[in-house]
């Protein structure tokens, strides 16, 4: 959902494309997606 994408972007300062990729890779879990981006 849109709010999950916005949450990932706001927490990681990444671009939209990267946020969507991370969410897809994490099964739509924003917390996991944020951790994934931050640990890359």
Residue ranges and their predicted role:
Residues 1-40:
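Short, amphipathic alpha-helical interaction segments embedded in low-complexity terminal/linker regions
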């Amino acid at each position: 959902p849109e709010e999950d994408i916005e949450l990932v972007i706001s927490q990681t300062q990444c671009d939209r494309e990267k946020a969507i990729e991370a969410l897809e890779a994490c099964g739509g879990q924003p917390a996991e997606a944020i951790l994934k981006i931050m640990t890359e």
